[in-house]
Design a protein with these regions (language model features):
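A conserved mid-protein helix/loop that constitutes part of the nucleotide-sugar donor-binding site
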Residues: 6, 190-213, 226-233, 278, ...
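Donor nucleotide-sugar binding/catalytic pocket of nucleotide-sugar-dependent glycosyltransferases
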Residues: 26, 105, 124-179, 187
């Protein structure tokens, strides 16, 4: 699963450890005729997870006719004090029409806007239909959480609701020990890893063309998605298959191994749809340098401090990315230093305990958040 799913599960289990009773409703990963209910287990703990059947996807949106029924049923079963909606997710907007849901306090976690300047006309048309319900949900919510201060000024849907917006950075649990620094070995190629769904906005085509311009650099792309076949074609057309490997989907343990064995992580996303980049936290927790694009209105270059915890390059620039990677190839100590500072920043700002404490304060379980923290 992707970064948002990782964050959501970490938040659920961390909230449970803080004394909350939690349950989640999500979509099935692939196409499914029937919904499922399971107790999702992790480290002697468990959380109720309802997976609403996804019939198919339209413009990357899961179509799940049973979502509203499953949500009503879950509310009746759990009788929650708070509903925490992770948007964008058109299925979650069924909450607007469910009387039992409307009687409960809502917190919205705004992960990204559905449409950006780069979105297709079809997605923009679909959004025109969804927008009134999205507006109703935002109006009903007590708070709207955004993950970085750089995102909010560029979000058109949130423009009218800035007074209820609160910035809480995402966080993840620590899968790496600080002692696990892996030195970048000079007498082998620089190892770059890219983790995540092969989506249109991820900029992997830019990364492949940049790798083609470099020497002594190897790339592992870990993930699957709609761009897989076009990326394979680029690899073949550029004749870089000896240095580039596309691995497809991987388990969490396999992803951790790829991070451990790499020298740096590259997230070359080209669009504000990449509002934060949870994978950056995974790399920083593993003491790896991060290379990111300077997308305006994204949190990527806020999470990664240029020349401190990573390097930021000009968005969509093949030559700038190639030069950035060459710099790390030439200066392996820089890669190590950036990674170690990234680990420190992760510990100070992006642990799951920190984000959980801030989120629970909005639920009313802790003292109300101070005015200075409101966006």
């Amino acid at each position: 699963h992707g970064g948002m799913e990782t964050y959501m599960m970490d938040l659920l289990f961390s909230s449970k450890q803080h004394g909350m009773e939690c349950a989640a409703i999500v979509h099935t990963t692939g196409r499914a005729a029937a919904s499922t209910v399971e107790e999702y287990k992790r480290d002697h703990d468990q959380v109720l997870v309802v997976r609403a059947a996804t019939w198919f996807k339209f413009l990357y949106v899961p179509i799940s006719p049973s979502f509203a029924w499953n949500l009503s049923r879950l509310i009746a079963r759990q009788r929650p004090d708070v509903i925490h909606l992770h948007l964008p997710n058109p299925s979650a907007l069924w909450s607007v029409f469910i009387p039992s849901a409307r009687r409960i306090t809502w917190i919205i976690h705004w992960q990204s806007d559905i449409v950006t300047a780069d979105s297709s006309w079809m997605l923009k048309t679909l959004y025109w239909l969804i927008r009134p319900f999205e507006y109703s949900a935002l109006k009903k919510a007590r708070y709207v959480i955004t993950s970085s201060p750089t995102f909010l000024p560029y979000s058109l849907p949130l423009r009218r609701f800035r007074k209820k917006c609160v910035t809480i950075p995402l966080g993840i649990r620590d899968n790496f020990e600080k002692s696990e620094y892996h030195n970048s070995i000079r007498d082998r190629p620089l190892r770059v890893v890219a983790l995540g769904r092969l989506a249109h906005y991820k900029g992997y085509d830019v990364l492949l063309r940049a790798i083609h311009r470099t020497k002594n650099i190897e790339l592992d792309i870990v993930g699957d998605g709609e761009q897989a076949s076009s990326l394979k074609k680029i690899v073949n057309d550029l004749a870089i298959s000896k240095r580039v490997r596309l691995h497809g989907a991987a388990t969490d343990a396999e992803k951790d191994r790829f991070l451990r064995e790499s020298d740096c992580l590259c997230l070359p996303s080209t669009d504000r749809t990449e509002s934060f980049g949870v994978v950056l936290l995974e790399a920083m927790s593993a003491s790896k340098a991060c290379v990111v694009s300077d997308v305006e209105g994204s949190g990527m270059s806020w999470v990664v401090d240029h020349e401190v915890t990573g390097l930021v390059f000009k968005n969509r620039s093949i030559s700038a990315l190639a030069a950035t990677l060459e710099r790390l190839e030439q200066d392996r100590q820089l890669a190590i230093d950036l990674g170690q500072k990234g680990r420190t920043k992760y510990e100070q700002n992006f642990t799951i305990d920190q984000t959980t404490a801030a989120v629970l304060s909005l639920y009313g379980r802790r003292p109300a958040i101070s005015e200075s923290q409101k966006g």
